[in-house]
Amino acid sequence: MAKMHTKRKGKSSSTRPIRTDPPEWCKIGADEVTTIVLDLWKQGVSTAEIGMVLRDRYGVPDAKLITGKKVTTILKENNVAPNIPEDLTNLIVKALGLRKHLSVNKKDVHNKRSLNLTESKIRRLVKYYKQEKVLPRDWFYKPETAEMMITR
């Protein structure tokens, strides 16, 4: 995968095998996976970490193979999904940390550039999520109000 804001190449990664049904060695059922996902979400675990916990602790290679639904879909069906997608939330938290750092270290030009690139990614993601109707049309990112959006 190519990198976005550099001339260098990105890291290559392995691709997952194409499967349509769960492997026979996986003995856990769809109802069990759903309850585990909901319990982990109530404990404050993010969706990416839920997938890793399912893989490492419970031997579930892919939640979608067993339940037929993604982790976020399971959360939406049980009305506990977050309003803002997780990748956008993580970028906003990163931008808030950079802004806090730059308020103390005003001459740090490298992190000024990093903040600029991060906020560009945020705007690009917001545009995509508006097109996909995940975010409402009137939603927009403002650095001044971003901290209130995240803590809600």
Curated annotation (Swiss-Prot):
Q: Which family, according to the similarity comment? A: Belongs to the universal ribosomal protein uS15 family.
**Cross-referenced SUPFAM superfamilies:** S15/NS1 RNA-binding domain
**Lineage from the top down?**
Archaea, Methanobacteriati, Methanobacteriota, Stenosarchaea group, Methanomicrobia
Region Disordered: list its residue ranges.
Answer: 1-23
Compositional bias ranges of the Basic residues kind: 1-11
Organism, per UniProt? Methanosarcina acetivorans (strain ATCC 35395 / DSM 2834 / JCM 12185 / C2A)
Give the UniProt entry's GO cellular component terms.
Answer: cytosolic small ribosomal subunit
The cross-references to SMART domains, in alphabetical order and at most eight, read: Ribosomal_S13_N, Ribosomal_S15
Q: Name one GO biological process term.
A: translation
Oligomeric state and interaction partners are given as: Part of the 30S ribosomal subunit.
Q: Which GO terms describe its molecular function?
A: small ribosomal subunit rRNA binding; structural constituent of ribosome
- The name of this protein is Small ribosomal subunit protein uS15
Q: What keywords sit in the KW lines?
A: Ribonucleoprotein, Ribosomal protein
